Amino acid sequence: MTFHVERIDHVVLRVRDLPGMVRFYEQALGFKVERTLERLSLVQMRAGASMLDLVKGERPAAGGNMDHLCFRIEPFDRDAIVTRLAPFGISVGETVERYGAEGNGPSVYFHDPEGNQIELKGPSASATH
């Protein structure tokens, strides 16, 4: 029997300030807490079909090789993005065209409160992949 990858199931970020990062992803990006496992210092958050796990802990000495994390958003409204991130003191880069799972579409980049680079990507101009 063979298998194929359908999509990324979840991403895990190690964070120093777990409550602060939960607040950021809830208030700035609209994630909802789905499950909390206190014994693991883990909060699992959902936005649509995407799952983001935040776990309290220091970043590992080795690794740290993820460039950025991209969330597909709908609709893409730069002004709304800037407005939602401003209370967190986060500035958003210029809107650029980037290729992703659905093709080319508008994207902006910023860093979350712990320095992870985040891309918010809007819909592609066409439905072709």
Model region roles, listed by residue range:
Residues 1-19, 68-69, 73, 124-129:
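N-terminal beta-strand motif that seeds the catalytic metal site of vicinal oxygen chelate
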Residues 5-7, 62-66, 102:
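Short glycine-enriched loop/turn motifs at secondary-structure junctions
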Residues 19-32:
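Amphipathic alpha-helical segments
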Residues 32-65, 75, 117-122:
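Conserved short beta-strand elements that form part of the metal-binding/catalytic scaffold
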Residues 18, 69-117:
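Vicinal oxygen chelate
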Residues 30-36, 91-96:
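Short secondary-structure junctions
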